Amino acid sequence: MKSTKLIHFLMWIVILSVLGLPSVLAQTVNTIHPTKTALSVKEFKNQRKIFEKVELFGPETDYLSTRMEKSITKSTVAAIDNKVLHQIFAEKPVALELEIPFLGQSIEIELIKVDILDAGFQAFSSGEPGKAIKYTPGAYYRGIIKGDEQSTIAISFFDDILYGMISSGDYGNITLNKLQDNGDYLIYSDRDLTIKQPGICETIEPEGYAQEIQRALSDQSLTTRATKCVKVYIETDYALYQNKGNSTTNVINYMTAVFNNVATLYANEQITTQVSEFYVWTSADGYSKTSSTTALNQFKSKRPSYNGDIAHLAALGGNNLGGVAWVDALCSNYG
């Protein structure tokens, strides 16, 4: 267990039951250079390795619920072959090539498997705090739209569900989200949302902090940045457990998929991150539902030490509280 250096409280206030994952890949399109993900794909090809082509998605369907029509102006709904999904989850091929149906066309994508969980990864719950949860990790991938080196993709495959994000200048940020009604997948771009995802950050930044970070990134080339892997401890609240059908597996699947999206952004900046440990609240968690700052302080008190370099609390409880973090804290001790 390590001393607490930085605790970052995240309040994932998204329409979880309707629109799926947060659009966290939006930053990746702001570059004229190939992304690190694109360079990884290129290196894989240069080694004459083979992308396994799979036919996962079926043709588009006409189904779209009234609830969805109020949120999205246009989208694609398509079924997937669950046998193929299970095969990807079970076999975890090194590289995949598949097509995503979207608004009458097919987006051809290339994916490479990544390891987002630390070799010693374990998960625990409040129900049995000292007993590790039996968890089978998903198949986690990053990649690009074929021929588009500025695009970035993160897709996570599990036994009965996949989560995915595709980000590019041409399409915006596309989300692949399983519909609860019939199991088909809703595929839409954030450009076509009629409502914007709410999100508030309550972090108090020192004056000029953002500019200082930007200068640091600009002054240091991608190839010379530190290669140390940042280990991340993740804790989830009781409300998220309830939202995911009172299933620890569902919670960990969902949050590791979210982490894959976020870690892809960091990977494009040559920062490697992995999840070192996971903790699921399967009972009342005691964190504030009215103030993210209060919840952050409670989290610090409850977790004076943890297995990782950074700790995140991902919470659904509360009402659009947003997120909060301590800034400039990695070199300081807390607790």
Task: Go through the PLM ranges and name each one.
Residues M1-T31:
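Bacterial Sec-dependent N-terminal signal peptides
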Residues K2, L16, P22, L39, ...:
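Intrinsically disordered, low-complexity segments enriched in Ser/Pro/Gly/Ala and basic residues
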Residues S3-I7, T28, L98, V114, ...:
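Intrinsic disorder/low-complexity segments enriched in polar/small residues
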Residues I13, E128-G130, N250:
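General secondary-structure propensity
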Residues A26-Q180, N297:
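N-terminal prosegments of processed precursors
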Residues V29-I32, R48, E52-Y63, D184-S332:
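Fold-level signature of zinc-dependent metallopeptidase catalytic domains
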